[in-house]
Amino acid sequence: MHKKIFLLPLLLLLSCNALWAQLFVITVQNKSALPFTDQLIEVPWLPLQQMLSADGNLSFKIINATTKQELAWQLEYIGQTTIQNLLVQVSVPANASLKLWGIKGIPKKIAAKTDCRYVPQRKDDFAWENDKIAFRMYGKALQGTNEDAYGIDVWVKRTHSLLLAERYKKNDYHIDHGNGLDYYHVGHTLGAGNIAPFVEDSIWYPGNYTEYKILDNGPLRSTFELRYVPWNVNGKMVSVIKIISLDAGSQLNFVKANYQLQGGATFFPVVVGIIKRNEPGSIFFNEGKGIIGYWEPEDKKNGTTGVGIVVASGKNMLLQKSQILLQASLDGGAINYYTGAAWSKAKEVANSESWFRYLQQFQQKKSTPLIVKLQKGSSR
């Protein structure tokens, strides 16, 4: 009888150790004075796969080592046939660290927070969204029509749910039914942060995209590729491939534009731009940090949209009658930048001050990113 009593605590301890046996450990360090909230971290898959192989490639869950709360994650392929990264959504306070455990078990199902899709029934739209905001680009079917537009279109939202599939199915875009709408006008401009060559003081717009490829599609990150046929830029033919990613929890997209210029040149000036309305709005710029923010004039019915761009290689701001431009340089024919939007009616970014602060803090976080380390589990 006494032996059973003494053995019980030992059995409980052993069962707890088995429950939390770690296949791997991820340490996330935040050296910034800013908190990171709902941020995606990337863990290279190959070393992680080797750790899992030792345990027979069992399915796994990821938990907060302190709270034991299960975290959402995604396997990222980036268009490849094999896994490239493990993506995990984390929140880390300023000047703090976080430890995650990978443990055996079947992960909980999570609702998708991002989506991207080709929409042939709407004249080749390519649309994408997350739990904050939505966007679309126009395809070749719209080119040359009176609906044609060169830039990125914004679809504002005030719901964390995905809505594009439902709204496209209903052919209903321009009325707010309580969850958002597309009231943003693009026209023959760069819209909400598109990019184009800038030669002889002129923007040389490409046509609309002609090919697409979905590289990943949720639940935490959606990535896709848009291709454009070559077009004339001051007497030379130029082509571009754009890769666009949108993470859950972010107001901004990541854009990588790869240009090819006739003759093999890899340097020519480009601009990233935002359409400017005729009525007064608020403009913020920091050329040294490569930030431009625009808080549009209020629409009495639909509220206010804020648009912003962050370009590490940005150098000169150009203010035109209808556009705000940030001139940038290519690195080997490529450029990376961020662009996105927010809506006052979503009540997360309510005014110009909060939008411009968001953009500045976004740039600061990219300058001091989270440090991610992967280790083998300490117990089996």
In which residue ranges do the predicted regions lie?
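Short, well-ordered beta-strand segments enriched in hydrophobic/aromatic residues
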Residues: 24-30, 132, 242, 253-261
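Extended, loop-rich substrate-binding clefts of extracytoplasmic carbohydrate-active enzymes
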Residues: 170-247
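Solvent-exposed N-terminal domain segments of exported/luminal and surface proteins
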Residues: 105-203
